[in-house]
């Protein structure tokens, strides 16, 4: 089983169930982001040597959400991406960026837009919008650690999760429990590895497009018809 933690998050599961029930009509556009808090220690530069890049490390979760909400059989028509190094120029040594935007077009006419960042000031900001023909459903568009608001002489404010693990703590617990149940009780695994492999392929193509500056196209069998090179 591949640990895409957001599939085990209570809010994302609720959003998925609402979409499946027809609450937003036909899902047509997905806009999602994975944005980490700035770490001035240089950790992300060292990590980039092994991570596969910001799309493979961060946006992979948004890509997996897309395949979940749009359906694992969705066929990619093209990917394109751009990125900048706003705070960590040394990331370019590893062909990586600290802010990046990616666009994925599917053969069925749907599109997905991804934003990834390593420089959030307040904390972890992972949000998603699924826009349909009759409405939209959003997840975490106003991040909050809990239900506490602080009122003082500066105004009203609330804290938000500081790390990815703070945000998805209970999703990791649910994931471990469901995997254990699959092993011990024979319950079905909650996700298909074929979709996980497809998510990695899309992430790698976005990373390549970002570095090369070229759009990458695919035929309906998944073969590349226009090749960008790092």
Regions found by a protein language model. Give the residues of each.
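A structural signal for well-ordered alpha-helical segments within the folded catalytic domains
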Residues: 9, 13, 53, 60-64, ...
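Short, hydrophobic secondary-structure boundary micro-motifs
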Residues: 27, 79, 160, 190-192, ...
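Contiguous beta-strand/loop segments that form the cofactor/metal-binding neighborhood of enzyme cores
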Residues: 64-147, 173-187, 204-205, 219-230
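Glycine- and charged-residue-rich phosphate/anionic-cofactor binding loop of Rossmann-like
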Residues: 2, 159-164, 182-199
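Predominantly a Rossmann-like dinucleotide-binding segment in NAD(P)-dependent oxidoreductases
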Residues: 1, 6-94, 213
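Hydrophobic side-chain positions on well-ordered alpha-helices
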Residues: 18, 181-182, 209
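Structured beta->alpha junctions
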Residues: 4-7, 118-120, 195, 222
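Short arginine-rich
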Residues: 202-212
């Amino acid at each position: 089983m591949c640990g895409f933690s957001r599939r085990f998050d209570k809010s994302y599961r609720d959003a998925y169930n609402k979409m499946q029930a027809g609450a937003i009509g036909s899902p047509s556009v997905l806009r999602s982001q994975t944005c980490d808090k700035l770490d001035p220690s240089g950790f992300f530069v060292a990590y980039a040597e092994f991570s596969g890049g910001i799309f493979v490390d961060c946006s992979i979760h948004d890509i997996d959400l897309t395949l979940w909400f749009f359906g694992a059989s969705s066929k990619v028509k093209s990917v394109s991406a751009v990125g900048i190094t706003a705070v960590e120029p040394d990331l370019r040594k590893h062909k990586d960026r600290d802010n990046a935007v990616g666009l994925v077009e599917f053969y069925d006419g749907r599109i997905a837009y991804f934003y990834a960042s390593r420089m959030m000031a307040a904390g972890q900001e992972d949000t998603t919008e699924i826009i349909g023909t009759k409405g939209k459903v959003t997840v975490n568009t106003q991040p909050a650690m809990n239900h506490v608001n602080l009122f003082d002489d500066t105004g009203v404010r609330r804290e938000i999760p500081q790390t990815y693990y703070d945000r998805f703590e209970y999703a990791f617990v649910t994931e471990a429990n469901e995997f254990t149940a699959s092993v011990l009780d024979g319950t079905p695994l909650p996700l298909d590895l074929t979709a996980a492999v497809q998510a990695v392929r899309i992430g790698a193509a976005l990373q390549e497009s970002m570095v090369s500056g070229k759009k990458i196209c695919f035929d309906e069998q998944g073969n590349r018809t226009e090749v960008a090179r790092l």
